[in-house]
């Protein structure tokens, strides 16, 4: 689960955006600038990332759900891969407005997706070629839009977002509903309203991979710890002294 300063350096987490695009609210996390590019202070980023991991780990240990969001081209595959590894829902294509604030409607779409999958497995022989084509197109669209959240039965307990500016609608919906946010914030965006800020590069594929892997590791570790605790509790109960009662003693 641990991420080192060296790993952050190698992934280019410290490279911010051009100085002319900076957001002054990120000043506490900026070390300086080089060639008109802001350099993010990794001595701040590392402990803040570790804090975000700790939160994700505790949440997972308490059976909470974290929704991973990364729809930028360089993040899609990495986010989907790590979310699947951790067994959590994810959004990797586009954020549909109302995905959280109008979750009731989204659940209807999820049901439609699951019904269509079951229908496909049963066979589409009764449909005409044209009907099959229309069916396939609808299924493909639903899979693309909500495939990553099809097993999310309720609103998530937290959201992990790579690039809070790019995903401002997701951030806004989470804030409105009081859902805690873990967010990667680059030098050109504001960290305000983000519960667990990770100051860092949100464009580099290597940096994105590091964040996604780190959060997925924390989730898996939290879940594993919870299982271990349950096993210990069961073992402790089972070790209580067993006294056999002689039924003939009376």
Swiss-Prot record:
Keywords assigned: Ribonucleoprotein, Ribosomal protein
One Gene Ontology molecular-function label: structural constituent of ribosome
Pfam families named in the record: Ribosomal_S2
Gene3D superfamilies xrefs: Glucose-6-phosphate isomerase like protein, domain 1 (3.40.50.10490), Helix hairpin bin (1.10.287.610)
GO cellular component terms listed in the entry, alphabetical order: cytosolic small ribosomal subunit
CDD domains given in the database record: RPS2
InterPro entries, A to Z: Ribosomal_uS2, Ribosomal_uS2_bac/mit/plastid, Ribosomal_uS2_CS, Ribosomal_uS2_flav_dom_sf
GO terms classed as biological process: translation
PANTHER family found in the cross-reference section: 30S RIBOSOMAL PROTEIN S2 PROKARYOTIC AND ORGANELLAR, SMALL RIBOSOMAL SUBUNIT PROTEIN US2M
Similarity comment text for this entry: Belongs to the universal ribosomal protein uS2 family.
Name of the featured protein: Small ribosomal subunit protein uS2
Natural source organism: Acidovorax sp. (strain JS42)
């Amino acid at each position: 689960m641990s991420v080192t300063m060296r790993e952050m350096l190698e992934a280019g987490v410290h490279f911010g955006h051009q100085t002319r695009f900076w957001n002054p609210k990120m000043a506490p996390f900026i070390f300086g600038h080089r060639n008109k590019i802001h350099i993010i202070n990794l001595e701040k980023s590392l402990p803040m990332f570790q804090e975000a991991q700790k939160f994700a780990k505790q949440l997972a240990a308490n059976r909470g759900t974290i929704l991973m969001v990364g729809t930028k081209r360089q993040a899609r595959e990495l986010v989907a891969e790590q979310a699947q590894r951790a067994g959590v829902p994810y959004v990797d294509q586009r954020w549909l407005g109302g995905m959280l604030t109008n979750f009731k409607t989204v659940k209807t779409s999820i049901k439609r997706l699951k019904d269509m999958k079951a229908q496909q497995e049963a066979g589409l022989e009764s449909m005409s070629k044209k009907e099959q084509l229309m069916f396939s197109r609808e299924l493909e669209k639903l899979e693309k839009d909500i495939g990553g959240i099809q097993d999310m039965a309720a609103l998530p307990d937290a959201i992990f977002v790579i690039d809070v500016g790019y995903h401002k609608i997701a951030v806004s919906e989470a804030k409105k509903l009081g859902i805690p946010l873990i967010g990667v914030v680059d030098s050109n965006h504001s960290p305000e309203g983000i519960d667990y800020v990770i100051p860092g590069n949100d464009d580099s594929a290597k940096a994105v991979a590091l964040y996604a892997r780190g959060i997925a590791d924390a989730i898996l570790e939290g879940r594993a710890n919870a299982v271990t605790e349950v096993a210990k509790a069961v073992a402790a109960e089972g070790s209580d002294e067993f006294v056999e009662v002689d039924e003939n003693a009376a």
